[in-house]
C-alpha cells in the first residue's frame, strides 16, 4: 500500500492527470465514512493527512463540494496556503519542482517531499499516515539552512493538539555531506516547513 503513494511520480512528467476526490469516488458516502479511525477526531485527522499528501503532490486537484463536513476551517486555510505558495503548484510539470525526501519508510509510514517554485522558494512537507507520534524524526533535507513550521494539520485551531510552533530548526550535517532536521510529526498529520538557506 505504501508504494501506491509514491508510484504516481514515476509517470508524473509523462502524462497529464488530476488528483481527484469526487462524487464518483465516494459512491454517495461522505469522505469521513470511508476512512479508518476509532472516533470522529481520528477520522478527521486521517482525512487531513490524506489531503495534505494530495495538496503537496504535483498535479491539479479536484475535491467534491460538500465533502468537507467538519473540516471547513481547515480546508479554507489549506486552500489559502496553497494559493499563496507557488512552490506547491508552479512547477507541477517540471522535475525541478519536486524532490522526494522520504519515500522508503513503509515501517513508520512517513512520506516527505520538497516542493520548489521558479524563484527558488522551497517547502518541505512530511506526512505521517499512522496514529503514532514521531518525536525527533530525522528528515534529510536538500537545503542547508533554517526551517520554520508554517502549517500543521494538528494545530488546535483545526481540532488537533498542537500549538503553533514558531521555533526555528537549524539543519545539521550527518557527516556524509547530508543535511537533516529533527522534527516532531503528530500522529495522522502533515506538517509543512519553509526553508531559508544559510
Identify the role of each PLM range.
Residues 1-69, 80-87, 92-93, 97-152, ...:
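Conserved alpha/beta catalytic core and glycan-binding cleft of carbohydrate-active enzymes
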Residues 40-45, 72, 173-180:
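Aromatic- and glycine-enriched glycan-recognition loops and surfaces
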Residues 75-78:
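Short amphipathic alpha-helical coiled-coil/interface segments
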Residues 128-129, 153, 187, 195:
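Residues immediately flanking
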Residues 145-175:
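Trp/Gly-enriched beta-strand surface patches
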Residues 164-198:
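C-terminal beta-strand-rich structural cap/linker in extracellular carbohydrate-active enzymes
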Amino acid at each position: 500500500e505504501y508504494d501506491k503513494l509514491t508510484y504516481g511520480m514515476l509517470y508524473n512528467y509523462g502524462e497529464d492527470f488530476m488528483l481527484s476526490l469526487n462524487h464518483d469516488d465516494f459512491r454517495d458516502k461522505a469522505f469521513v465514512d470511508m476512512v479508518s479511525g476509532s472516533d470522529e477526531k481520528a477520522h478527521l485527522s486521517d482525512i487531513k493527512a490524506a489531503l495534505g499528501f494530495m495538496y503537496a503532490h504535483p498535479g491539479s486537484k479536484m475535491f467534491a463540494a460538500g465533502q468537507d463536513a467538519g473540516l471547513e476551517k481547515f480546508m479554507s486555510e489549506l486552500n489559502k496556503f496553497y494559493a499563496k505558495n507557488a512552490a506547491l503548484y508552479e512547477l507541477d510539470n517540471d522535475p525541478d519542482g519536486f524532490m522526494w525526501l522520504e519515500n522508503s519508510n513503509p515501517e513508520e509510514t512517513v512520506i516527505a517531499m520538497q516542493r520548489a517554485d521558479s524563484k527558488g522558494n522551497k517547502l518541505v512537507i512530511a506526512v505521517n499516515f499512522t496514529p503514532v507520534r514521531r518525536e525527533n524524526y530525522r528528515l534529510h533535507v536538500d537545503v542547508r539552512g533554517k526551517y520554520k513550521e508554517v502549517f500543521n494539520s494538528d494545530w488546535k485551531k483545526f481540532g488537533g493538539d498542537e500549538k503553533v510552533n514558531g521555533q526555528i530548526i537549524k539543519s545539521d550535517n550527518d557527516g556524509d555531506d547530508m543535511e537533516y532536521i529533527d522534527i516532531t510529526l503528530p500522529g495522522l498529520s502533515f506538517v509543512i516547513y519553509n526553508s531559508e538557506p544559510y
